[in-house]
UniProtKB/Swiss-Prot annotation:
The modification Phosphotyrosine is found at residue 914. The modification N-acetylalanine is found at residue 2. The modification Phosphothreonine is found at residues 184, 1708. This is Protein virilizer homolog. GO terms for biological process: mRNA processing; RNA splicing. Keywords: Acetylation, Cytoplasm, Developmental protein, Methylation, mRNA processing, mRNA splicing, Nucleus, Phosphoprotein. It comes from Homo sapiens (Human). Residues 139-152, 174-190 have a biased composition (Pro residues). Residues 160-169, 584-596 have a biased composition (Basic and acidic residues).
Length: 1812
């Protein structure tokens, strides 16, 4: 055959499919490099194909005589497309039609053939693209991963990700052996995981082996080939399966074939890890090992020569595969990671831009359609409009007014058409003239009565219509003076309110365009602006409707002005930043370095860094604060816009409440988006997130996030993001940058990206982009086109990939539940389920299966039931139509309660009845409808959170009445109880919350039930006229909180759990409203009201069971008010202060009734060695003491009693024994003494003035005696350090309830001191004790440092200094001893003691105003400065105190000077110390002879302290600051700090056998374990495991279970032989390790729950044990908490309280120390804050892991800076050492109180799952 000279024969071969009947077949031709295809020929039977072939292969064998052959090709110009493109079809007829020529020369590296043939001989002609083939030899560059469905040339695929994402494709076809030649399209995507009808995956099949080798005839290249085999199932199961194969293959060829090329590219990079796996995979699947030599062939190709290999080895022959994948194999595939970072937004399709007017949209639609598309509606409207304009050029009578009324309806279609077609005719100008005449009062007055009002109203409506005609319309109106015209109308006399409202509507339309707003705000020369005129109008005596309408316009103006101001600040920032000198960057880095290396000074460094940033950018803190306020204002205005910025309908009346009436009519958001667009708001936000000075500011981040989050909640907001797609792409990149940074550092960023908002926003916009593609696909495609179109499948596949991680899943659920988005999937399903398509064809369509899965995911994960209201009927109809589809049947179960349901108040009884009937099926596959029923009930009966300016809708009150009458309360309590009973068992065994679906269902049910209960109880108890004594509610809530919200300290509650905790707290707090103020309060009524009963339940639950300790304490802490004073930037009104104080008194009263329980709690936990519980106890004690004096005395008495009992428990004659219990009690007392209320209660009790409390004064003296003689035992040393720290708190006058303030009438200094310091007798003994400690050579370094700092506190005022001098007279050698010790032990580590001691001496020498803090600023200014001191010690007296007989102080100072000088060579920090030494030495040298201390001083007499009750009543309730101090705002309590404790000290011998016989004699361990581990917990979408499986064959659930996700709890038995996703996925497999045993050597990956280790499999195989679904077998204890969390402990958004706060500005997490080994060690050395691998399965399909519970080991010391209670602690004088030297690694530095004393931050242990 003649072949064109430019062409060569690329391929010639015969595909055979011997089969009894004719059916559709698919074959693949793969070229080893890129080729251009010019022609494809089908060789008829008997025709010689090629002259140079041997006879036995030279002739065509094609049969039958005619058939249609479809061809698809891999488009190499779109490397990222997930599907093959269609090449075309050949209607083959052996007599007439055998040649197919593509329309253009196609370059490709693979073809797919499909047709109803049994045998096909095919020749392909074309040319080789040498260049490209050369390129392909080297691996492609690694840019970002999976692209958006529209192929974008700019986006290349990241090989690292391409694979795993594809690997799982739909339902995740298993990681199959990839033949490197002719490719087999894998099977239909989301197959239904029907048990009875598993969809076969045509992965590969029996290749017809064609006779001898064929290498002799290939011309230039030899594409290896392999006919696509049929799986056994196909031929066995007849027609339906074949159709399914055909249908599946058809789109699969579309969807999947190219994927395999990507895998191949990856193979090149995976270095020899594959061959063995594939070989094993084959054998292990129990298939025949037919082709050993093939595998050898594989071994020879190494990754770097892959591209060339095929060209060189023309004889190379590929093995064929006949692998049948079972459901089990599918489930064992490691999860694919979906990397969203590559997907960029593209211009908006289908939907229109949210800020464009209807007129603008119509114009752009006409332009797009082009002039040829005749639009009859537009033509008619334009003709009519032209007629009207021509007809009434002069006439201004009744007909003209009628014409004016008709015009608005013609403008959109008619005027737009005229403007496009007939540009010369000035219709718009004429309309503007008419409008101005219609608004003219003079013209109106000439009209007959009634007609004149019609004319004015028609004029205002015409203004609104023309204002919508884009810039042209508004500009025309403005030039004609429309604003003045409208104001004339508004200011005119005798104009009715309704006409004024019309005028306001017109004005509103004008300012809704930015040009109009500019004109309105500016005004013309020498004329008031529209804004000023409007204010004047409102200030006149107007009706309420007119004022409301005017206010709405003012609100819009304010919004516009705020945006203008933000833009101004943004431009200013941009200019300053661009003009910055370059050197600012390196400075920043050095700071950061300093911060890392020296954790002790972290706070200072951070502050200096911020200052450097501020200075370098010339941006003042004030400007940043202003920016934050403006952003917050934007958020507030947008939130309230629907109630404050819309023009009310003329007939409505603004009232406080309404019961009926239309919903809000107007939508303010398009206008606001227009303003945002015109101010380039998204670009500004991106700028703020990119400039270091603003992006590092938590306030800016939080404010921007609030605005963005608000926008992303609505469809229009998302469309706004998409219409500004370029800015959005940059914005998301900037946000993700923070997310990455935080992961890098192992930190949780400050609340901005804490909830993966960046990913959620990205996934939401991507989802909507996919929806726009679906809609535009339906617009373009007609029904006659083939069903599974490649673009359509690409889009659906992308959507499906997004659902693979929890953030993406929630984003998909959210976006599909908005407006009509779900219709896109329903349309698809309705199209495929049409009978016209033929039953089997539609059911096997891939797109249909995708749509089923996606709709199911949306219904499961979205709580927004508005979409169900619209679509439930059509969805139920689809479920009914296809009864064989498991996905749809499951969907039917979810939608069951919606049959014939109207979403109105009347449906409440039916839904509650449904809940009652199904309560026993809770959390089972049959009971999923319960979740839907509860969601609908929430929607119908629970009001949305109130927004300022909103009318109260009384229909919600009616709904609550319905709930009560339908026995809702009882039903919901039963739901909670049932939920608790189901969750308790797995929770006790530390099992995670199950799969994503199980978790979503649990959280959703809990949230809905809690919301309903909250609504009912709030309504019931609000007035105080009802009492509610059903204690099942608090009891169920306490249990639920324990199960869902108690987590180990490294963890944080995620946003869902946080919301559940908030709901639980809110419900419990509603019980505090049920107190009738009018009742007289007696002991009895107090004990029996709802508040007390709720408290009793909560308090008794704390000690009920050990598992509830921690949760109970958190719950109590969350319920109690925060300690005062509040920090604020505004003065708080006296009324609000009294409310705050009264609330605390009420709490105190009700708690006092439960005094015994409170004491029991404090006593029980005081001795705990479990640090989290110790920490929570301290926190609760502080909160209780802060309420009022009775609770403060109660708690402090209890603590002091414990110390008394502990110290007196030893017999009298022996020396007192100090145990570790003593240290814990003193540590508790020390922690409490640093808080105001607790300290004053302690002082009150140890004064010894109250009858019956004398024992406390005695015990205090015992403690002072202990400090004087520390002894050498470690425990005594610890006790001494705690006692000195307690003394320091008692002597700090800043720890006081009444703070000195600069306001008039504030108390005098002496009164202040009398109320905050110990009395005269105590002060004397304390000073004696301090000096004795200094003189004692046994005192520890920390102890000395604390004592010196305490003396510095005392030296600030005459009262303290007087007592110090008195003690110095008694103990004159103390200062000398200390100086000597400082000199003799001086080193870099003890420099702090030397420095403090010198500072103290300088302080007592000096009688001027003391600024002992060095840098007395910050809060000091707020708190009020300390007044001057008159007393002092002169230099001669000091010289006397410092000398002894042996040596003079000058010599000691000289020696110290030498030492300091020597050390300062290495350490610059000692320079200032050197100056102090020299200065003091000179003062002493010049002072002359030493003199004894004078005793001439007058003793300052303090007034008697006020009673504790008075102090509480007059306490400082708030602290005013210029700028919010973020540390104080977010954290009132030191975050949990780990201390290293010598655990051996706390070991107690216990006889467990004896204990078990005594306490649990009837407990049968064997049966309990059997019950726990062999019973199957039910959960949605689970099937029971079959017992006694055969290896490799036991039934496992399919890869996508009922939820569309795999349960991944029970690992498949053969997981260790499945090849891993190549070169990507879970942390680099197969890199230099034995390829077939990756599981034994892998690191732990905490992005998913722990799966079984390979050794467990071996054990399981030998024992035939089935690990149960749901509860992992009790293997090694789980080592680390899998809850992916980050730093800072528990979050809390109730005023920054959670159990340990999310705000972590000053709390660095424990660093993870290297990698955790999977198998060694106990539960990890610390609860390290772990990094969430970005976006990939942190809650994994395999079930999100909850957190570990159980005994909590001591944590490693963390590096951080704690919160210091005293304002002056910020300054250098610091607090005493955190205390115990034994608790700190480097206690030499004596860090401040609450510091985490050891540092070290390192990368967390995750290998990053994604690379950017």
């Amino acid at each position: 055959m003649a072949v064109d000279s430019a062409m060569e024969l690329l391929f010639l071969d015969t595909f055979k499919h011997p089969s009894a009947e004719q059916s559709s077949h698919i074959d693949v031709v793969r070229f080893p490099c890129v080729v251009y295809i010019n022609e494809v020929r089908v060789i008829p039977p008997g025709v010689r194909a090629h002259s140079s072939l041997p006879d036995n292969r030279a002739y065509g064998e094609t049969s039958p005589h005619t058939f249609q052959l479809d061809l698809f090709f891999n488009n190499v110009s779109k490397p990222s497309a997930p599907v093959f493109d269609r090449l075309g079809s050949l209607e083959y007829d052996e007599n007439t039609s055998i040649i197919f020529r593509p329309n253009s020369k196609v370059n490709t590296d693979g073809l797919v053939l499909r047709g109803w043939y049994n045998c096909l001989t095919l020749a392909i002609y074309g040319s080789v693209d040498r260049v490209i083939s050369h390129d392909r030899d080297s691996p492609p560059p690694p840019p970002p991963p999976p692209p958006p469905p529209q192929p974008q040339p700019s986006l290349k695929r990241n090989p690292k990700h391409a694979d795993g994402e594809k690997e799982d494709q739909f339902n995740g076809s298993p990681p199959r052996p990839q033949p490197r030649g002719p490719r087999t399209p894998p099977g239909p995507p989301p197959p239904d995981d029907d048990e009875d009808d598993p969809v076969p995956l045509p992965v590969s099949g029996d290749k017809e082996e064609d006779a001898p080798h064929r290498e002799d005839y290939f011309e230039p290249i030899s594409p290896d080939r392999n006919s696509v085999p049929q799986e056994g199932q196909y031929s066995d199961e007849g027609e339906v399966e074949e159709e399914q194969q055909e249908e599946g293959e058809e789109d699969e060829d579309d969807v999947d074939v190219e994927e395999e090329e990507d895998e191949d590219e990856d193979d090149r990079r995976t270095v020899d890890s594959i061959p063995e796996e594939e070989e094993e995979d084959e054998e292990e699947e129990g298939e025949e090992d037919e082709e050993g030599e093939g595998d050898d062939g594989y071994e020879q190709i190494s990754s770097d020569e892959d591209g060339i290999a095929d060209l060189e080895r023309e004889t190379f022959k590929y093995p064929n595969f006949d692998v049948e994948y079972t459901a089990e194999d599918l489930a064992s595939v490691p999860p694919m990671t979906y990397d969203p970072y590559d997907r960029e937004l593209v211009p908006l399709l289908y939907f229109s831009c949210p800020y464009k007017t209807t007129f603008e949209i119509e114009i752009s639609r006409m332009k797009d359609q082009g002039p040829d598309k005749e639009n009859s509606g537009a033509i008619e409207a334009s003709v009519k409009l032209t007629e009207l304009l021509d007809l009434y050029r002069e006439d201004r009578g009744a007909k003209w007014v009628t014409a004016l009324e008709e015009i608005p309806s013609l403008i959109i279609k008619g005027l737009s058409y005229l403007q496009l077609k007939n540009t010369k005719q000035d219709s718009l100008g004429q309309l503007v003239d008419w409008t101005m005449q219609a608004l003219n009062l003079q013209v109106a007055l000439r009209q007959p009565i009634a007609l004149n009002v019609r004319q004015l109203k028609a004029g205002t409506k015409l203004v609104s219509s023309l204002a919508e005609c884009g810039a042209q319309g508004v500009t025309g109106l403005l030039q004609a003076g429309v604003i003045s015209g409208l104001f004339e109308l508004l200011f005119a006399d005798h104009v009715s309110s309704s006409l004024k409202l019309n005028a306001f509507k017109a004005l509103d339309s004008v300012i809704s365009m930015t040009e109009g707003m500019e004109a309105f705000l500016r005004g013309r020369q020498n004329e008031k602006s529209g804004y000023q005129k409007l204010l004047e109008l409102i200030l006149l005596d107007q009706t309420v409707r007119v004022v409301t309408a005017g206010s709405a316009i003012l609100q819009k103006c304010h919004f516009y002005e705020v945006l203008s101001e933000i833009k101004r600040l943004g431009d200013h920032l941009a200019e300053k930043t661009s003009s910055l000198p370059n050197h600012s960057e390196p400075d920043h880095d050095t700071d950061a370095g300093l911060e890392r290396t020296n954790p002790e000074y972290e706070n200072e460094v951070e502050a200096s860094m911020d200052m450097d940033l501020l200075e370098s950018s010339n941006i003042s803190e004030g400007e940043i604060e202003r920016l934050i306020n403006l952003l917050e204002e934007v958020f507030h205005l947008m939130e309230t816009a629907p109630h404050t910025m819309i023009q009310q309908p003329v007939k409505s009346f603004p009232t406080m409440a309404r019961i009926t009436g239309p919903p809000e009519r107007d939508d303010p958001y398009p206008v606001l988006f227009r303003y945002l667009h015109s101010h380039h708001f998204l670009e500004l936000v991106t700028l703020l997130l990119s400039i270091p000075v603003t992006s590092a500011h938590p306030g800016v981040l939080q404010a921007t996030k609030d605005v963005l989050k608000f926008l992303a909640q609505s469809q229009k907001g998302l469309l706004f993001f998409m219409s500004e797609y370029e800015a959005t792409n940059l914005l998301i990149r900037a946000l993700c940058h923070f997310y990455d940074q935080d992961e890098e550092e192992g930190l949780q960023s400050d609340g901005v990206i804490d909830d993966a908002f960046a990913l959620w926003l990205q996934d939401s916009t991507q989802t909507l982009q996919c929806i726009t593609e679906l809609f535009s696909h339906f617009q373009r495609c007609t029904a006659s086109e083939e069903t599974d179109h490649s673009d359509l499948l690409g889009t659906l596949h992308n959507l499906y990939l997004i659902t693979f991680n929890p953030v993406g899943r929630s984003a998909v659920g959210h976006v599909f539940s908005l407006e009509k988005n779900l219709q896109s999937l329903i349309t698809l399903m309705e199209y495929y389920s049409k009978e016209a398509l033929g039953d089997s064809k539609s059911k096997k369509s891939v797109a249909y299966n995708y749509a089923c899965i996606l709709i199911l995911v949306v219904v499961q994960s979205s709580s927004d039931v508005q979409m169900l209201e619209q679509h439930a009927a059509s969805l139920l109809k689809l479920c009914k139509a296809d009864e064989n589809n498991a996905k749809l049947q499951e969907l039917g179960k979810w939608l069951e309660p919606l049959k014939n349901l109207r979403f109105e108040i009347n449906c409440i009884p039916n839904l509650i009845e449904y809940v009652k009937q199904n309560i026993d099926n809770l959390m089972t596959p049959e009971g999923v409808g319960l979740t839907t029923a509860l969601r609908v009930l929430c929607n119908v009966a629970c009001p949305p959170p109130p927004v300022e300016g909103q009318q109260k809708d009384l229909k919600w009150n009616l709904a609550v009445i319905q709930l009560f009458s339908a026995e809702g309360m009882d039903t919901f309590i039963r739901v909670l109880q049932k939920l608790n009973s189901i969750l308790t068992q797995p929770w006790r065994l530390h099992v995670n919350m199950g799969t994503t679906l199980h978790r979503v269902t649990t959280i959703s049910m809990a949230r809905c039930t809690l919301t309903l209960l909250k609504t009912m109880l709030t309504e019931l108890l609000r007035g105080g006229s009802f009492e509610f004594k059903d204690m099942r509610v608090p009891s169920a809530l306490v249990t639920l909180h324990m199960l869902l919200c108690s987590i180990p300290l490294s963890g944080r509650l995620d946003s869902d759990e946080q919301k559940i905790q908030n709901d639980i707290i809110d419900i419990l707090l509603t019980f505090t409203q049920g107190v009738n103020e009018k009742l007289t309060i007696s002991e009895e009524t107090l004990a029996n009201n709802t508040w007390s009963l709720m408290l009793k339940e909560v308090l008794s639950s704390i000690l009920k069971v050990p598992e509830g300790f921690f949760s109970g304490l958190i719950l109590l802490s969350e319920l109690l008010p925060l300690p005062l004073p509040m920090q604020t930037t505004q003065v708080i009104e006296p009324h609000d202060i009294s409310v705050a104080l009264n609330t605390r008194k009420l709490w105190s009263m009700h708690l006092h009734v439960q005094a015994k329980l409170l004491q029991e709690i404090v006593r029980s936990f005081s001795g705990t060695t479990c640090q989290p519980i110790q920490h929570m106890l301290r926190r609760i004690c502080v909160q209780l003491c802060d309420l009022a004096s009775p609770t403060a005395l109660l708690i402090m008495r209890t603590v002091l009693d414990l110390i008394v009992e502990d110290l007196q428990s030893t017999s009298e004659d022996k020396e007192k024994q100090y145990t570790s219990q003593t240290t814990r009690l003193l540590a508790l007392l020390d922690a409490l003494a640093s808080h105001k209320a607790c300290k004053l209660a302690i002082l009150h009790l140890i004064n010894g003035t109250i009858k019956g409390d004398e024992r406390y004064a005695e015990i205090f003296q015992d403690l002072l005696a202990l400090v004087r003689s520390p002894g050498d035992s470690v425990i005594r040393q610890q006790c001494v350090e705690y006692v000195t720290s307690i003394l320091q708190s008692l002597c700090d006058q800043d720890i006081a309830l009444i703070l000195p303030s600069s306001s008039e009438g504030s108390i005098s200094e002496l009164e202040q001191l009398s109320n905050s310091l110990p009395n005269k007798e105590l002060m004397t003994s304390i000073c004696d004790c301090l000096l004795a400690t200094l003189a004692n050579s046994e005192s520890s370094y920390n102890c000395l440092l604390t004592c010196v700092r305490t003396m510095m506190f005392l030296a600030e005022h005459d009262y303290g200094l007087f007592h110090l001098k008195s003690s110095l007279r008694k103990n004159s050698s103390a200062l000398h001893s200390l100086l000597k010790r400082v000199v003799s032990t001086f080193s870099k580590d003890t420099g702090e003691l030397a420095s403090s001691f010198l500072e103290f001496m300088r302080q007592i020498l000096n009688s001027d105003t003391i600024g002992c803090c060095g840098d007395d600023n910050g809060l000091m200014e707020v708190e009020g400065a300390h007044t001057s001191r008159t007393m002092s010690i002169n230099a001669a007296e000091l010289k006397q105190l410092l000398q002894s007989k042996e040596e003079s102080p000058e010599n000691l100072f000289l020696e110290l000077e030498k030492l300091v000088l020597e050390h300062s060579k290495d350490d610059d920090n000692l320079d200032s110390l050197l100056d102090s030494v020299v200065g003091l030495k000179q003062m002493l040298e010049s002072s002359g002879d030493p003199l004894p201390l004078s005793d001439q001083d007058v003793e300052p007499v303090l007034s008697a302290p006020e009673s504790l009750q008075n102090l509480f009543n007059n306490r400082t309730a708030y602290v005013l600051a210029d700028v919010m101090d973020d540390q104080l705002k977010s954290m009132w309590f030191t975050p949990f700090q780990a201390e290293e404790i010598d655990t051996d000290l706390d070991l107690v011998k216990v006889d467990l056998i004896e204990l078990s016989e005594k306490c649990c004699s009837d407990f049968d361990l064997h049966s309990e374990l059997e019950r726990s581990f062999l019973s199957e917990p039910s959960s949605p979408g689970r099937t029971k495991t079959t017992k006694g499986f055969k290896l490799g064959k036991h039934k496992h659930e399919t890869f996508i279970t009922s939820s569309g996700k795999s349960e991944y709890i029970e690992p498949a038995k053969r997981a260790h032989v499945v090849p891993p996703p190549r070169g990507r996925g879970r942390g680099g497999f197969g890199q230099g390790i034995r390829p077939h045993d990756i599981f034994r050597q892998r690191k732990q990956n905490t992005s998913r729950p722990p799966s079984m280790h390979v050794d467990d499999f071996v054990a399981a195989e030998s024992k035939e044990v089935v690990p149960q679904d749901g509860i992992p077998p009790p293997k090694r204890p789980l080592k680390v908490s899998q809850k992916i969390s980050s730093r800072g402990g528990f979050s809390g958004n109730r005023g920054g309280r959670g159990a340990f706060h999310s705000q972590n500005r000053f709390f660095t997490p424990p660093a993870s120390k290297g990698n955790y080994s999977r198998r060694e060690g106990t539960r990890g050395s610390s609860w390290s804050a772990q990094n969430t691998p970005r976006g990939n399965y942190n809650e994994s399909r395999g079930g999100q892991s909850n957190f570990n519970r159980g005994p909590l080991p001591p944590l490693r010391p963390l590096s951080s800076t704690g919160y210091r209670p005293s304002p002056r602690d910020r300054a250098s004088r610091g607090r005493g050492g955190l205390g115990p030297s034994w608790a700190s690694a480097n206690s030499g530095s004596g860090g401040s109180r609450g510091k985490f004393v050891s540092g070290g931050s390192g990368r967390g242990r995750h290998v990053r799952s994604f690379t950017r």
